[in-house]
Amino acid sequence: MLNQEKNKFVFMITQIRGRLIEKSPTEVVVDCNGIGYSINISLNTFSKIGSDENIKLYTHLIIKEDSHSLYGFFEKSERSLFRLLISVSGVGASTGRMMLSSLSPNEIVSAIMTENVQVIQSIKGIGLKTSQRVILELKDKVLSLEGSEQQELNLNNESSEAASALEVLGYSQKQTSKILSKIITENPGINV
């Protein structure tokens, strides 16, 4: 077992590699040396799993008094985001999986970074208070996720000219960043 102080999780099964036996939008069964593991997945992971017979998933094991549940993710960054989401009070594993099924990890990170309550609240089962709590508790933490720095860097490079123009018009740097991030998130192909 690996104890990581940073997240205060104890990880026992961190990945599974094996033969794909069954696949549905909510779970897969992976045969690993004769043992079939039932693994809960998000729609995001489901969409990335091909029809290949061999599969590798990064996992998170949740042990409760009455159940052991294994959650699988196609990418480490999705697993990291899941772990952050379930660290928020009021967000359990099912809600975390629902969030990752409703929005892509990049959309969730972007909504948190831009404090876009409406995007997070649009997810089934997430109310106003929970969406505000997710943003408040994770805003600083999502920057440590793999890919978030790159996303922010791309946002800065793409929109530096637009940001300068908005600042000349009197908007603060924080307001400018929020506005441009929202525009780029809502219109991914747009050139600002």
Task: Give residue spans per PLM region.
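Strongly charged, low-complexity linkers/loops
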Residues: 134-184
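Structure-specific DNA junction-binding interface
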Residues: 2-87, 192
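A general alpha-helix detector
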Residues: 80-84, 95, 116-119, 158-165, ...
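Short amphipathic alpha-helical segments at helix boundaries and their inter-helical linkers
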Residues: 110-113, 184-192
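A short amphipathic alpha-helix within small helical-bundle interaction modules
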Residues: 85, 100, 108-113, 120, ...
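Amphipathic, charged-and-aliphatic alpha-helical interface segments
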Residues: 68-73, 93-112, 133-146
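Anionic-ligand binding region
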Residues: 115-125, 134
